[in-house]
Amino acid sequence: MNFHILFCSSRHVTIELDEDAIYETASYEIWVNGRLKGVFHRMIQTIDGLLPDTDYEIMLVRANEASDTVTFHTEPEPITLNVRDFGAFGDGVHDDTSAIQAAILCCPKNARVLIPKGTYPVTALFLKSDMILELQENAVLAGIYDRARTPILPGQIEYDNEDGYYNLGSWEGNPIDSFASMITGIHVKNVTICGKGVLDGRADFENWWSRPKDKIRAWRPRMIFLNHCENITVVGVTVQNSPAWNLHPYFSNQIRFLDMEVKGPANSHNTDGCDPESCTNVEIAGVHFSVGDDCIAIKSGKIYMGKKFKVPSKHIHIRQSWMQDGHGAVTVGSEIAAG
């Protein structure tokens, strides 16, 4: 049996088996430096609990068959910033937005912001470049439904000394005011979001999914919104109960979604799984989708955006994923004016 390293960070490695199976295969063991890490059955699997800047050997075993040993070296990581040290409670009651945001803003280059076990109510968090955001197992970022407290991303802000506008918010293919997402990236690069934790929007029919066709202050947020971002990897986490689309990379490049769960009720409104819009080099691999709209919808804006920017979506690579519930597995559009 053969495999290769799909992704490696400071504390995680993701492997992909080189077999003909789709999403799942016969059970196999993963051994790291001679120690059993567990028995697994998915074609793409992430192993955590590694140390930064360290050499490792990994081998797979199935019955009497063993793979070749593959060596890898984890990325360096200068420091960990624990959000509890910045005042986050993680008790499911206090609003932990400002404490977690402070940790993100203080994070030095290539360091880790750690969210340990607990439930952390938040509105919107804004990423910065060159960082790792890790949600440990049983760590939950829990969405706060409060339109008055959630930041708005303006759709169009006119430039002072030149023609055109600065576009931050987007809704269904147009530059329109929208609420900032639980995880928002604006012009950031080199970010990893990882771990076994959960991003839970806590949307239901009493809040965000009520009156889905109405703009109330702004249009509904996504769970992860990446606007003009580059080299972003999301691996291992579960994303669920989104107010609208779950994963929305927008005019971005080199975006990876690996070994994830994306979930929402089958009757939830506009909860697309992953909608790359005017993006290049997007990889979606080992993702389990079960949502209330299209699992994956490739987009490039409505007619206005298509004519103005002429940025198509291209080089979108999708494999080893399970589309369970959803209106469509992989769709093109709507909102595909730029191709």
Which residues does each PLM region occupy?
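Extracellular/periplasmic carbohydrate-active domains that bind, remodel
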Residues: 1-339
